[in-house]
UniProtKB/Swiss-Prot annotation:
Protein family: Belongs to the ATP-dependent DNA ligase family.
Residues passing through the membrane, by range: none
Binding site residues for ATP: 252, 259, 274, 303, 343, 414, 420
Listed name of the protein: DNA ligase
Matches recorded under InterPro entries: ATP-dep_DNA_ligase (IPR050191), DNA_ligae_ATP-dep_bac/arc (IPR022865), DNA_ligase_ATP-dep (IPR000977), DNA_ligase_ATP-dep_C (IPR012309), DNA_ligase_ATP-dep_cent (IPR012310), DNA_ligase_ATP-dep_CS (IPR016059), DNA_ligase_ATP-dep_N (IPR012308), DNA_ligase_N_sf (IPR036599)
Cofactor(s) recorded in Swiss-Prot or TrEMBL: Mg(2+)
The organism of origin for this protein: Natronomonas pharaonis (strain ATCC 35678 / DSM 2160 / CIP 103997 / JCM 8858 / NBRC 14720 / NCIMB 2260 / Gabara)
NCBIfam families listed in its UniProt record: dnl1, LigA_Halo
Domain of life of the native organism: Archaea
């Protein structure tokens, strides 16, 4: 498929406000994609790689602006791009407005006056090469490859190419739309597509399988050791709710650590974060433990916790120091010890256990590991739950989890089968989408942060956070967010959604101040959720539930 055809279809999808018609348009796009089906299914969501693949393009706004300016000719520079961006508000519109192709005569790209048409597969290959570029000269190489794409792009192509490069397709298509479109395009049941997406974590693979092998092929898609899936999630709840619903509750400790998914292929282990980033290298002692303890291939779910020499848990920030460490891991290991608490078993020796009840999955887990298994207790009344919770808190842990003993494991879902019960202040995980410059001694730092919840198509602000941040933390946050700054207008700064804050609050109020309709009362910075991406942040739907 030529990229011009994809861009034209994407423009049509963007202009369609109705959800059902959008699904139909995406379904038609998938049906017409031919050999590019897998790529098209990802591109329309703004993805270059499958969801399970943590490979990143590593192209920031500045590099994109430079490539665009170069393709626009000698009379345009990056500052011009940023000025236009401030005027129109999004990079796609800027790219579309430029007269690209002004540098075709450059010898580096063969000269000539005819533009070689972009294709979907060609764009994918170039972006994959961009992601693989590393070492000295890689920045220049990325800029030149990106320039070549923009230099060959027609206006509509440039709009969606720029958005794709920065991961912001802005056409209102998410995983749910693609799921429904695959089902419609290839006449397979939507629940079958949903299950396959949960297991494969790759919409391209699922789309191709649905087209080529139908429902039977989707049913054959299983877990693969080394291919991570999204973690099953919990929502807030009470012991009374759990016992009323289930009769008996499975109760386990809620650790103040970081979620990990363990993949062991029979020889070596790999670890993945909740965000599906590989964290094998920073956690060698966990890898060693798994490789010494397991005798058959398996996929486990668990938590890695920083501990003192006596096993007492250390603060959450300590484990994040280990997750972020890429160099001198041995020294970090000496400084901060970690332990694995496995609490679920998804796959054992070729057998998927997603549809197996929790109680049985935990039994299988205990048969695999002699140590490192999070204990699972069963309670029939609220007093028993309270006793277990007290023991967990006395041991220095965060609280408890309540789980339905009969529940299956549904990757990526947040439902009533897992409930988290914490005694601490209520918090939300929110995306930083803006900031304001500080005052006084903080005048050279971003000092107040706009935090937003996930919405149907983007993010909606629910408050501003300035309290709870030390001067040292503020400097770190400033450095962390500076590469994601899009535009500035006076003291107001627009920030690309990339960093998730955990924000404490006293109350959620209805308010006309923000487009979300809500405002946090007394919001307070708790920390950065290094284990979460913007797509994992709390949604407006959850805030609706909390306020109802």
């Amino acid at each position: 498929m030529e990229f011009a055809e994809f861009a034209a279809r994407a423009a049509e999808i963007e202009s369609e406000p109705a959800d059902l018609e959008t699904v139909d348009l995406v379904a038609t796009l998938c049906a017409d994609a031919g050999d590019d089906l897998g790529t098209v299914a990802r591109f329309v969501q703004g993805r270059v790689f499958p969801a399970h693949d943590s490979t990143k393009l590593d192209i920031g706004p500045s590099l994109c602006y430079e490539a665009l300016a170069k393709a626009a000719g000698p009379n345009v520079d990056s500052d011009d791009i940023e000025r236009r961006l401030a005027e129109v508000g999004e990079i796609g519109a800027v790219a579309e407005s430029l007269d690209l192709g002004g540098q075709q005569g450059l010898a580096a790209f063969g000269g000539g006056t005819d533009r070689e048409a972009l294709t979907v597969s060609g764009v994918e290959e170039t972006l994959q090469a961009l992601a693989a570029a590393a070492g000295d000269g890689s920045t220049d190489a990325k800029r030149d490859r990106l320039f070549d794409l923009f230099n060959r792009a027609e206006p509509t192509e440039a709009r969606f190419l720029a958005r794709l490069v920065l991961g912001e397709m802005r056409v209102g298509v998410g995983e749910g739309t693609v799921r429904d479109a695959i089902a419609a395009a290839f006449e397979v049941p939507e629940p079958d597509v949903e299950r396959a997406l949960q297991v494969a974590n790759d919409c391209g693979l699922v789309a191709e399988t649905a087209r080529d092998d139908g429902a039977a092929g989707l049913d054959d898609i299983g877990l693969v050791v080394g291919r991570p899936v999204k973690a099953m999630l919990a929502q807030a709840g009470t012991a009374v709710e759990a016992l009323d619903e289930w009769g008996t509750a499975a109760v386990e400790t809620k650790y103040d650590g970081a979620r990990v998914q363990v993949h062991y292929d029979g020889d070596s282990a790999r670890l993945f974060s909740r965000n599906l980033e590989e964290v094998t290298e920073p956690l060698p002692e966990v890898v060693e433990f798994v490789e010494q303890s397991l005798s058959v291939p398996a996929i486990l779910d668990g938590e890695v916790v920083a501990v003192d020499d006596d096993g007492t848990p250390r603060p959450f920030q300590e484990i994040l120091r280990r997750f972020r460490r890429k160099h001198d891991v041995a020294a970090a290991r000496e400084d901060v010890s970690v332990e694995l608490y496995a609490f679920d078993c998804l796959h054992v020796d070729g057998e998927d256990l997603l549809d197996t009840p929790l109680s049985e999955r935990h039994d299988r887990l205990e048969s695999l590991l002699a140590d490192g298994v999070s204990p699972l207790s069963y309670a029939d009344d609220a007093d028993e739950v309270a006793d277990i919770e007290a023991d967990a808190l006395d041991a220095g842990h965060e609280g408890i989890m309540l789980k339905n003993p009969d529940s299956t494991y549904t990757p990526g879902s947040r439902g009533k089968n897992w409930l988290k019960r914490k005694p601490d202040v209520e918090t939300l995980d929110l995306v930083v989408t803006g900031a304001e410059w500080g005052e006084g001694r903080r005048a050279n730092l971003l000092g107040t942060f706009v935090v937003s919840a996930r919405a149907d198509d983007g993010y909606e602000p629910v408050g501003k956070v300035a309290t709870g941040i030390t001067d040292e933390e503020l400097e770190r946050l400033h450095e962390r967010l500076q590469p994601h700054v899009r535009t500035e207008d006076g003291t107001d700064v627009d920030i690309e959604p990339a960093v998730v804050f955990e924000v404490g609050y006293e109350e959620i109020q209805q308010s006309p101040t923000y487009g979300s309709g809500y405002a946090l009362r007394f919001p307070r910075f708790v920390g950065v959720r290094e284990d979460k991406s913007p797509s994992d942040a709390d949604s407006l739907e959850r805030i609706d539930r909390l306020t109802s």
